[in-house]
Amino acid sequence: MIIYLHGFDSTSPGNHEKVLQLQFIDDDVRFINYSTLHPKHDMQHLLKEVSKVIDQSDDPNPLICGVGLGGYWSERIGFLCGIKQVMFNPNLHPENTMAGRIDRPEEYEDIATKCVDQFRAKNQGRCLVILSKEDEIHDNTKTASELEKHYDIIWDESQSHKFKKISQHLQAMKEFKNT
């Protein structure tokens, strides 16, 4: 089973396209929607929904993945639920990048203070990061320097921030999921 979390643009047709692409490596792909506007509520909602679909599945190696803000949540929710994660162009600091887009971006700071200390060290090897050199939203060299000591990073040469086409990374995801 693969759980897919959308980014800030929850209505993008690219979300459906990514779900279809993910079905090439696992026919059980679950799309979990969340508001993107209320971080504390989103965290509770995602924990509940992801736990529920994990319990419903008999897959011994479920995987959670997301793009942008969905990558942020995939890492945290996947860690808390004990499943592997794949992040595409993750938004690592939504407390900064979401300012002006949502009412209370400071809720992300509060979430960070409640997270397990050094959770990335404890999550070592459980997350695969795919970063685009053409991300027009984030400087992925900074993202890489923050994550490379904990996770393997794959660089993509052509995709934009929303990562419309993930098919070239499906084999790496499948191998990561099943190891």
From Swiss-Prot:
Q: Which InterPro entries match?
A: AB_hydrolase_fold, UPF0227, UPF0227/Esterase_YqiA
- Cysteine pairs forming cystine bridges in this chain are none
Task: Please provide an example of a Pfam family that matches this protein in its UniProt record.
Answer: UPF0227
Hey, which family's this protein in? Belongs to the UPF0227 family.
State what protein this is by name: UPF0227 protein VP0969
Per the UniProt record, the lineage of the source organism begins with: Bacteria, Pseudomonadati, Pseudomonadota, Gammaproteobacteria, Vibrionales
